[in-house]
Design a protein with these regions (language model features):
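C-terminal beta-strand-rich structural cap/linker in extracellular carbohydrate-active enzymes
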Residues: 32, 74-76, 593-628, 670
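Conserved, mostly hydrophobic/aromatic
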Residues: 30, 80, 142, 173, ...
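C-terminal accessory region downstream of the catalytic core in glycan-modifying enzymes
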Residues: 482, 559-594
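Aromatic- and acidic-residue-enriched carbohydrate-binding clefts of CAZyme catalytic domains
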Residues: 153-162, 193-249, 253, 260-279, ...
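Carboxylate/His-rich catalytic cores and anion/metal-binding grooves
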Residues: 174-210, 370, 378-382
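Carbohydrate-binding surface patches
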Residues: 25-35, 514-566
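The feature marks proteins involved in alpha-glucan
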Residues: 1-23, 49-51, 59-143, 148-154
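Conserved alpha/beta catalytic core and glycan-binding cleft of carbohydrate-active enzymes
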Residues: 105-108, 112, 281, 293-445, ...
Length: 674
């Protein structure tokens, strides 16, 4: 042991694993089955240890080595030596030697932890967690590097691809309307995939310098990744906390992904989850890989922390709804329905309604592993050639349809169909009862060029190209509108799953299913049409008033179908909130400007389209006033409003024309007005 350091007396306490600041020094705890263990102290650039302190065998508790060392640790770094082999601390809170992303020059170099960081105090300035319930959440899934790494991000160069870059985009997130940011693994891991030789003549070699861009690998689960810190990567701890504080200040939540491969001790996983909740004020953790979900799900320290996992079988939920299911079931089934597969109606109604009272549900139409939303409507097959594995990696089950051409297309018909299918997908997502999740960039047509497994693509394939905000502005506007629409109407995000019953005795069930005829739902395997009626008396608007009535008509058949419309109470009329077939209005109508259906008993829903009707109360007009207005304004309105045409119906814009039968009789079956 070097002069200036001495082993202090133990006080009999049980210390947390890793490093803990104590009076006059530091306490070190390390778990190992080895026969001997030593603490090695270094100066930052030192190659030889400044001090080697052997853990006294008498202070060993089971397989946990403990020692309190007194002295000045300023500017020093540490590792452990077990049976003569040097190893980093798995409980380390920050690491040096990994600051430069993808640098092959650091291979074989030392990876050490600063000692002093364990005792630093951060000023949270009264930070509080928003604690947004699942039914009010809209999750936005990002990669901490790829979100702002592209030059088009508008973030200054030094902050691109960093935690600070994420914080700089908070105004954009607020404008979009999301409430919660989910971040792919932000912990320290080695992104360099070591080259490997082929095991057989038919398997490709993994080339030198390949990077693990996603971060789903074993890492150091207590340290934020230094390469995601600005400048030279010296302050990842402070920058991550600054980002969290900035998000909370604007009412946004942060959920992080932690990956475990199942080889970790359950106590290590539990310690990591508790640490991020306490030390970094994260609002939730998405457990990826293999984690002891029962241990975490029933832990009292985590009972108010959002915990996301593929399933929670066998876990006893607490009083607060903090657990949530997170898997691909919604995505795969809804994509199948979207592209017109048969026998999907039962799955549609299940996912639209699914929202258990004690466990949340996370829904998405696209996520990390698979096609983006734009690629889902642009490619029939994966195109992973850039991964260097002969296109063998990644799933072959994408449930996608390219709308008539593989990859980019300039054909107007194909582009219109793709936009419509994206609008359909977004309505399916945001009108379902579970918590919607949007993958970064899907709100403005991000593409990964058909790559559905971009785990190693640290380039334009994975980085978010913000210039698409301009070229695909219609998708962006639609997403903002549908998020706002969902927030304003609680019938689409109830606290518990709809009962399909009139349990309040208001004359209608909370939610009911309909076929082409009202109150006659049909679920035959060959059908692709369904109507869903929402009774507004079971929901509240943000101002506390009763919600509106809604009728959502789904037609994923490649032919149009006429839907009978449910009757509304007296003085209520149906208004068109969304019609995904109407490309000229981007499939939506502004709040307060929804066209009204006058005395209309049915509506033709075009092929592969979704129509959302809103039942609102309309003040009755006196006949004289109506006649006077009609006489003076008839000609002016005919000239002012465009005509909207479909294969089976012809109607004019607000306050014009009638619905004409496709039979050619010209019979007026109802006027469409605003």
């Amino acid at each position: 042991m070097k002069e200036g350091f001495q082993i202090g007396r133990t006080d009999g306490r049980i210390y947390a694993m890793g490093v803990t600041a104590v009076a006059g020094g530091m306490h070190f705890s390390y778990a190992s089955k080895g026969k001997s263990c030593a603490l090695l102290l270094y100066k930052k650039e030192g190659t030889a240890p400044l001090a080697r302190i052997l853990f006294p065998d008498g202070l060993r508790t089971g397989d946990v080595w403990n020692v309190t060392v007194l002295g000045d640790f300023e500017g020093l770094f540490y590792t452990y030596e077990v049976d003569g082999k040097e190893t980093p601390d798995p409980y380390g809170r920050q690491f040096t030697g990994m600051e430069h992303w993808g640098s092959l020059g650091r291979l074989g170099g030392p990876v050490r932890c600063p000692v002093s960081g364990a005792g630093e105090i951060y000023d949270w300035e009264g930070d509080t967690l928003p604690r947004i319930p699942y039914e009010q959440c809209v999750i936005y899934h990002i990669h901490p590097r790829g979100f702002t790494r592209h030059a088009s991000s508008g973030v200054k160069q030094a902050d691109r691809g960093t935690f600070k870059g994420v914080a700089d985009k908070i105004p954009y997130l607020k404008e979009l309307g999301v409430t919660t940011v989910e971040m792919m693994p932000p912990v320290e891991f080695d992104e360099i995939i070591m080259p490997s030789h082929q095991d057989s003549p038919f398997e490709p070699e993994i080339p030198d310098g390949k990077l693990n861009y996603w971060g789903y690998t074993r890492g150091y689960s207590f340290a934020p990744k230094s390469a995601y810190s600005g400048g030279s990567g010296k302050e990842p701890v402070r920058e991550f906390k600054d980002m969290v504080k900035a998000l909370h200040r604007e009412g946004l939540e942060i959920v992080i992904e932690l990956f475990f491969d199942g080889k970790e001790a359950p106590a290590y996983v539990l310690d990591a989850a508790r640490f991020w909740a306490h030390e970094y004020h994260v609002d939730g953790i998405h457990l990826v890989g293999h984690a002891p979900v029962k241990l975490l799900g029933e832990d009292p320290y985590l009972s108010r922390l959002k915990l996301l996992a593929p399933g929670w079988d066998g876990v006893e939920p607490g009083q607060v709804k903090h657990l949530a299911e997170y898997n691909d079931g919604f995505m795969m089934d809804m994509r199948s329905f979207l592209k017109g597969d048969e026998d999907q109606l039962n799955r549609l109604v299940y996912h639209i309604r699914h929202n258990p009272q004690q466990v949340g549900v996370i829904n998405y139409m696209a996520n990390t592993n698979g096609f983006t939303l734009m690629d889902m409507v642009s490619y029939d097959i994966k195109h992973n050639e850039a991964n260097g594995e002969d296109n063998r990696d990644g799933t072959d089950y994408n449930q996608s349809w390219n709308c008539g051409a593989e990859g980019p297309s300039r054909k107007k018909r194909i582009m219109q169909m793709r936009r419509k299918q994206i609008r359909n997908a977004l309505l399916m997502l945001f009108l379902s009862q579970g918590t919607p999740l949007l993958m970064m960039g899907d709100e403005f047509g991000r593409t990964k060029k058909g790559n559905n497994n971009s785990y190693c693509q640290d380039n334009d394939i994975s980085w978010l190209n913000w210039s698409l905000l301009n070229s695909n502005s219609s998708i962006h506007e639609f997403v903002k509108h549908v998020i706002r629409f969902r927030k304003e109407h609680s019938v689409f995000h109830m606290e518990k799953e709809p009962a399909l019953m009139d349990y309040r005795c208001v004359g209608l069930p909370d939610v009911s299913y309909h076929g082409l005829k009202t109150w006659c739902p049909m679920f035959d395997r060959f059908l692709r049409q369904l109507g869903i009626l929402y009774c507004g008396k079971y929901g509240k608007k943000p101002d506390g008033r009763e919600d509106d009535y809604f009728y959502v008509a789904f037609n994923m058949h490649w032919e149009p179908h006429e839907f009978a419309l449910p009757n509304l109470p007296k003085d209520f009329k149906w208004h068109i909130a969304f019609n995904t077939d109407e490309d000229r209005v981007n499939g939506m109508y502004p709040r307060g400007g929804e066209p009204v259906l006058e005395n209309q008993k049915s509506m033709m829903i075009m092929a592969r389209a979704i129509v959302v009707l809103m039942g609102k109360e309309v003040a009755p007009l006196k006949k004289a006033a109506r006649g006077k207005a009609a006489g003076k304004g008839e000609r002016r309105e005919e000239e002012a409003h465009d005509t909207v045409r479909g294969n089976d119906t012809v109607y004019r814009g607000p306050q014009a024309g009638g619905i004409r039968s496709s039979s050619g009789t010209g019979q007026n079956t109802g006027a469409l007005q605003s």
